């Protein structure tokens, strides 16, 4: 999605007085001397969940975790006449809103801030709100409503293929739907969400734990501004009855953090992202989804270059790494610039120690729009991929929409990982990253288009969970198109094939085929045109055991 807005923190600072338009300014402090907070009492600024995460990953609490000295903050406000937008403990900084000042007063206020003994520098991070008139650039295709009134024979409806590509239905069948897992969503807004029945279960079950507006903290309203976040959230948790739709993690707990201004692209959105990341850490969230990105801005002097995509220039990228180092799994969209002159990933997906998610189509083929790696310092990007082209999600009036973008592939991974976290609690987030990449189709031969490939989350669980049966040394790599009206293609890996069976959802055998000699090719093609509409199990039999996948039969 281009939301993939882009912000940059250059290593070369520009003077705040170089831009005279009133707006928002980032103020860097020199130290935390005299702070009322102490490392001896972290309960004052970290929740019990956050403290437990630090113990799990053996991460010490350091001075970087101490909140900004409130005396410094108040001194900036008193000297400038501005209002507080955010503070950042990790950067030891604050963002001050000076948009109400005229130009002459602004120059005087900036001079006063710069003269404070504990201020290192001041940087312009956004223009005044009244100057924000540029339309937001969204990294998605135009939404297309789908006429779909007939119920499905599975709970997933049109979402089945995009979930099955990751083996998420198998996690659900085993009882893992994200229950008890805490998921943060950083996005542009959740317009229309309040009126959509797809989120009834989320509200009624009390799993919408927190909403926070980092764009307009003085007049918060996350249910305004844009509906991109609504789509992202729907991919994870939406539920419509009669088998019309089910998201990737329909039982997880969700925290909605609005970090994007729908009308503009300025670096202040990185300030918002950093503030959201620090709150996610303080709350002890398990995983966050950021279907956002930063590279170019409405003010071209703020633009990044590809050389900046090294994880250490963008403040959002730095914060993403620090959040990960504090035990939170960070999932970021790679970007949708694959067909543009800038075809690389965007911040914060260039960060170290995070999952950067690319996009494929429904058959697992690389989507051309998906941004490429590597990071500018040569690290593998993207990390993994899944369906982001023509993904399905609920929209207004209980209709089903369809759109494309890495904004849509990332939440499928986030939701799937939430289900896995329910299955294996208290696992180091870096270990999760190792496991999911090792369980992907290109684990042994990653590239800069699909990274390690498409993960099989069920196989990942079986491989790493004591007490679950191990998979044999083969798997059905892909079964497509799914749904199908006539022809079914099956790609296999591993052991020679002895035969196959198709049965209905009750287990009743409908058709089977056995080979006189082992089938050593990894491709099968079946004609299923005579099957009635419905859900079926395809079972592959090899010299080492059986493997089963679900497919849907549609009418012509």
Task: Please place each PLM-identified region on the residue numbering.
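Inhibitory N-terminal propeptides of secreted protease zymogens
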Residues: 19-142
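Protease zymogen maturation seam
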Residues: 112-182, 194-198
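Subtilisin-like serine protease catalytic core
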Residues: 159, 169-269, 283-286, 299-300, ...
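C-terminal subdomain of the subtilisin-like protease fold in secreted/lumenal serine endopeptidases
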Residues: 160, 283-289, 422-477, 482, ...
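Substrate-binding/access-modulating region of protease and related hydrolase catalytic domains
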Residues: 172, 179, 239-242, 256-350, ...
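Extracellular S/T/G-rich loop segment that most often corresponds to the catalytic His/Ser-adjacent loop
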Residues: 187, 349-422, 426, 459
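Surface-exposed, proline-anchored Ser/Thr-rich loop/turn motifs
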Residues: 468-493, 503-510, 533, 552-556
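C-terminal tail/sorting-segment detector
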Residues: 512, 529, 533-556
């Amino acid at each position: 999605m281009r939301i993939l807005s882009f912000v940059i923190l250059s290593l070369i600072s520009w003077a705040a007085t170089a831009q005279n338009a009133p707006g928002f300014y980032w103020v860097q402090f020199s130290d935390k001397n005299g702070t009322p907070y102490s490392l001896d009492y972290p309960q004052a600024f970290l929740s019990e969940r956050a403290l437990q995460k630090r113990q799990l990953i053996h991460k010490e609490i350091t001075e970087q975790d101490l909140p900004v000295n409130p005396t410094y903050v108040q001194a900036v406000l008193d000297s400038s006449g501005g209002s507080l937008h955010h503070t950042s403990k990790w950067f030891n900084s604050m963002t001050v809103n000076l948009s109400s000042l005229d130009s002459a007063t602004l120059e005087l206020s900036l001079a006063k801030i710069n003269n404070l003994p504990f201020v290192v520098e001041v940087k312009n991070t956004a223009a005044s709100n009244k100057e924000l008139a540029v339309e937001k650039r969204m990294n998605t295709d135009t939404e297309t409503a789908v006429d779909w009134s007939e119920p499905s024979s599975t709970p997933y409806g049109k979402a089945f293929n995009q979930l099955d590509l990751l083996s998420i239905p198998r996690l659900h069948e085993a009882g893992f739907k994200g229950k008890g897992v805490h998921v943060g969503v950083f996005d542009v807004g959740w317009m229309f969400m309040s009126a959509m029945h797809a989120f009834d279960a989320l509200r009624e079950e009390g799993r919408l734990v927190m909403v926070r507006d980092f764009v307009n903290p003085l007049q918060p309203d996350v249910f305004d501004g844009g509906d991109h976040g609504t789509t992202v959230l729907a991919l994870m948790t939406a539920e419509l009855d009669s088998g019309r739709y089910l998201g990737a993690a329909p039982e997880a707990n969700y925290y909605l953090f609005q970090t994007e201004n729908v009308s503009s692209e300025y670096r202040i959105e990185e300030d918002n992202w950093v503030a959201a990341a620090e709150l996610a850490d303080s709350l002890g969230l398990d995983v966050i989804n950021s279907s956002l990105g930063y590279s170019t801005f409405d003010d071209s002097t703020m633009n990044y270059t590809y050389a900046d995509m090294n994880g250490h220039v963008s403040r959002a990228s730095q914060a993403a790494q620090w959040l990960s180092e504090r035990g939170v799994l960070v999932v970021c969209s790679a970007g949708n610039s694959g067909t543009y002159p800038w075809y690389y990933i965007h911040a914060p997906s260039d960060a170290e120690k995070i999952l950067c998610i690319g996009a494929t189509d429904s058959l697992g083929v690389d989507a051309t729009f998906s941004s490429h790696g590597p990071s500018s310092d040569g690290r593998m990007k993207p990390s993994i991929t899944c369906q982001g082209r023509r993904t399905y999600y609920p929209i207004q009036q209980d209709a089903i929409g369809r759109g494309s973008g890495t904004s849509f592939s990332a939440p499928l991974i986030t939701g799937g990982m939430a289900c896995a976290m329910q299955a294996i609690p208290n696992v180091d987030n870096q270990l999760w990253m190792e496991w999911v990449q090792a369980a992907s189709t290109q684990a042994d031969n990653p590239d800069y288009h699909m990274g390690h490939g498409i993960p099989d989350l069920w196989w990942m669980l079986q491989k790493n969970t004591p007490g679950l049966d191990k998979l044999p040394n083969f798997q059905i790599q892909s079964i497509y198109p799914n749904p199908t009206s006539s022809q079914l293609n099956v790609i296999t890996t591993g052991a020679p094939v002895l035969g196959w069976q198709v049965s209905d959802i009750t287990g009743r055998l409908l058709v089977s085929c056995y080979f006189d000699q082992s089938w050593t090719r990894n491709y099968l093609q079946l004609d299923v045109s005579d099957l009635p509409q419905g859900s079926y199990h395809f079972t592959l039999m090899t010299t080492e055991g059986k493997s089963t996948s679900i497919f849907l039969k549609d009418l012509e």
